[in-house]
Amino acid sequence: MASSSHFLYSHHHSYASYNSKSHFNSFTNATFPQFSSFKPNGSSSFRKKLQSSRIHIIRAAASDPTTGRNQLEVVYDLENKLNKLADEVDREAGISRLTLFSPCKINVFLRITGKREDGFHDLASLFHVISLGDKIKFSLSPSKFNGSFVTNVPGVPLDEKNLIIKALNLFRKKTGTDKHFWIHLDKKVPTGAGLGGGSSNAATALWAANQFSGCIATEKDLQEWSGEIGSDIPFFFSHGAAYCTGRGEVVEDIPPPVPRDLSMVLMKPQEACPTGEVYKRLRLDQTSDIDPLVLLEKISKGGISQDVCVNDLEPPAFEVVPSLKRLKQRIAAAGRSQYDAVFMSGSGSTIVGVGSPDPPQFVYDGDEYKNIFFSEAKFITRSANQWYSEPLSTDESPSFPQDAE
């Protein structure tokens, strides 16, 4: 197996998803003092309820021949009692743990339409969420002043440079809440890939913080706030497919323009493409002149093909990482009958082959591409008021050529 630190994942302890009914039911044969450490916030105390309120089942029994009186049998129904208490915990104690999928995106096309006075560039792009993603586990910290942040890969910043931390700080600033979290980031999306993995993490953190706070902000609020810390973050508050303009923060939801079962393969060499370097080498007089709305219409009517997958950042990215140009050319040549289109996502360095989940055979041959990252993926979307779900039918685990048989 290749020794790339970004793709060797350590085993870690997973937080069990919390289900209060099963938690309480596990104590069916136990005694009440085992609940004594549970002190939920709110107007009432569940411990008092445990001690004072009881649920009984009253059953009529046959008359006693010795007394001639009818008897009543009183049965204490512990299981029913605990189920009702569990429901009250869910209502009054709120969420304590939450695990969310944090998917990445690709740019099906990316036009750069001009440079702004603030130094940023205007773009027009079809963004789409795909099924490769990270998992983030949030646990509510008992402290109102600090939390913790760990991840399974080296090199990921664990301080305020990380977009997750920036997002949570932003949420506290905007809402006045004081909740902090223990966070475990299970990273599968490579960094420096043009896939928006960090932006997705930030959007997921904002969503999680809002859930822990009783959804005090709207999705529109979260989307608008997120633009303050990253241009790509607002997109993830769309439903998964969007036409994005401005710096990327102007997001227009569109109906999914491509089938969600359309397969693709993502291939990324070890070299990253620093976004700043790519934009420095961008020459606007050498970009495409095709109207991005024409590209969007063509995709909506005819699907993905090579002629619509325009990316104005490819030429400068190929200058920054020359081997990336060769990789794209080889994939396109080898996969003429395999892929509908081959293109770079974002500012690189991921090359996307749409139409097949398999990489071309040459990546298995020799040592040149022994450390390449590749993963299959599909297009996904989300429903209103729900976060993205990890598809169950697709294996998005990153792979290495030398791992194949």
From Swiss-Prot:
Enzyme Commission number: 2.7.1.148
Localisation per UniProt entry: Plastid, Chloroplast
Segment annotated as transit peptide: 1-97
Origin: domain of life: Eukaryota
One GO process term, biological-process aspect: isopentenyl diphosphate biosynthetic process, methylerythritol 4-phosphate pathway
GO terms for cellular component: chloroplast
Protein's name according to its UniProt entry: 4-diphosphocytidyl-2-C-methyl-D-erythritol kinase, chloroplastic
Family, per entry: Belongs to the GHMP kinase family. IspE subfamily.
Function: Catalyzes the phosphorylation of the position 2 hydroxy group of 4-diphosphocytidyl-2C-methyl-D-erythritol.
Keywords, ordered alphabetically: ATP-binding, Chloroplast, Isoprene biosynthesis, Kinase, Nucleotide-binding, Plastid, Transferase, Transit peptide
Stored Gene3D superfamilies: 3.30.230.10, GHMP kinase, C-terminal domain
Location (main, coarse): plastid
Catalytic activity: 4-CDP-2-C-methyl-D-erythritol + ATP = 4-CDP-2-C-methyl-D-erythritol 2-phosphate + ADP + H(+)
EC top class, as a word: transferase
Binding residues annotated for ATP, in chain numbering: 190-200
Gene Ontology terms for molecular function: 4-(cytidine 5'-diphospho)-2-C-methyl-D-erythritol kinase activity; ATP binding
InterPro entries membership: GHMP_kinase_C_dom, GHMP_kinase_C_sf, GHMP_kinase_N_dom, IspE, Ribosomal_Su5_D2-typ_SF, Ribsml_uS5_D2-typ_fold_subgr
This protein's pathway: Isoprenoid biosynthesis; isopentenyl diphosphate biosynthesis via DXP pathway; isopentenyl diphosphate from 1-deoxy-D-xylulose 5-phosphate: step 3/6
Chain's gene name: ISPE
Signal sequence residues: none
